From Swiss-Prot:
Cellular localisation: Cytoplasm
Organism field: Methanosarcina mazei (strain ATCC BAA-159 / DSM 3647 / Goe1 / Go1 / JCM 11833 / OCM 88)
SMART domains: Semialdhyde_dh
Name of the protein in its database record: N-acetyl-gamma-glutamyl-phosphate reductase
EC number: 1.2.1.38
Origin: domain of life: Archaea
Enzyme class name: oxidoreductase
């Protein structure tokens, strides 16, 4: 690009905001213009994100939306669910582009209101920013970044769903503690989680709605979709096991052919063979996928691994940003994981 993208982050003090800062500070086409926090205004950003010491000298601000719009070409919303809709209308009242990392615009409005129990105040549409399924994000000014669990689950099943081969889909996902956010909860409190696995919201997790929405867009006849999450005692990563019961028996070779074709030219989806590892994707924007066919039971077991803060959140947002500004989608993101 001839000019730098002037980017701002609203809600920069949490894990997602911090990961946006970490990735953007070294992006060759981005100038970080502002990072907002109402409670930390005036304090150095590096005072809360210590790993960024020496990499940026920004201080937290709390400017009005008109000023943010005037200063930024792009704004990332890293705010709680139910608050993104309070920012979007004014931010989009001009040429500023917006990527919303909250859930506010991911779902159809009636579904959102039912799942989140919040009355939606801004019924505009956004592209669901899972680039591997929605390349049209490149033409948009407003993108709804997908949730972390749905990213791993949808990518694990999309090729078979698009082929119309799935009868029943059952997703079992395990996430690191950072998925619960920066404020401790009962499930993320160390004494409760150490040497433990904590399942929660066994049949009614709100991310199921995104999984259903996207897989049924690929196959309108697919209706039997289940999802159960667990928290595990690691900091980053989501490991998803998808039990995909198929309409006809498939071999592992059949599955590999379908997945290789579907993800051809999708640089952030890798099919390395074997069982995907969280350590192989930690700190990166990759989604690693493995699979094995259980031909006797018309079942395909698909495994996916992502970093919940990168491909599951901030990295995926930057992948969308790259396309929205005419850049190669790997720009600033093509780095290996931090294994071990």
């Amino acid at each position: 690009m001839n000019t730098m993208i002037k980017a701002g982050i609203i809600g920069a003090s949490g894990y997602t905001g911090g990961e946006l800062l970490r990735l953007l500070v070294s992006h060759p086409d981005v100038s970080l213009e502002l990072a907002t926090s109402r409670s930390l205004a005036g304090k150095p950003v590096a005072s809360t994100h210590r790993h960024l010491e020496g990499f940026l000298d920004l201080k937290y601000e709390n400017p009005g939306l008109e000023e943010i719009r005037e200063r930024c070409d792009l704004v990332f919303l890293a705010v709680p669910h139910g608050t993104g809709m309070n920012y979007v209308p004014e931010l989009l009242d001009g040429s500023t582009k917006v990527i919303d990392l909250s859930a506010d615009y991911r779902l159809d409005i009636p579904v959102f209101e039912k799942i989140y129990g919040i009355k939606h105040s801004d019924p505009r549409n956004a592209v669901y920013g899972l680039v591997e399924l929605h390349p049209e994000a490149a033409r948009e000014y407003f993108v709804a970044n997908p949730g972390c669990f749905p990213t791993g689950a949808i990518l694990s099943a999309a090729p078979l769903a698009a082929a119309g081969l799935i009868d029943i889909a059952v997703f079992d996902s395990k996430t690191g503690i950072s998925g619960a956010g920066i404020s401790p909860t009962e499930t993320s409190h160390y004494p409760n989680l150490a040497e433990n696995i904590v399942p929660y919201k066994l049949t009614a997790h709100r991310h199921r709605a995104e999984i259903v929405q996207e897989l049924t867009r690929l196959d309108g006849n697919l209706r039997n979709i289940s999802f159960t999450p667990h928290v595990i005692p690691t900091i980053r990563g989501i490991s998803t096991t998808a039990h995909l019961f198929t309409k006809e028996p498939l071999s592992t070779e059949d599955v590999r052919g379908i997945y290789e074709e579907f993800y051809r030219d999708k640089p952030f989806v890798r099919l390395p063979g074997g069982v995907p590892s969280l350590t192989a994707v930690r700190g990166s924007n990759f989604c690693d996928i493995g699979f094995e066919a259980d031909k006797e039971n018309n079942r395909v077991v698909v495994l996916s691994a992502i970093d919940n803060l990168v491909k599951g959140a901030s990295g995926q947002a930057i992948q969308n940003m790259n396309l929205m500004f005419g850049l190669v989608e790997t720009r600033g993101l093509w780095t290996p994981a931090t294994a071990p």
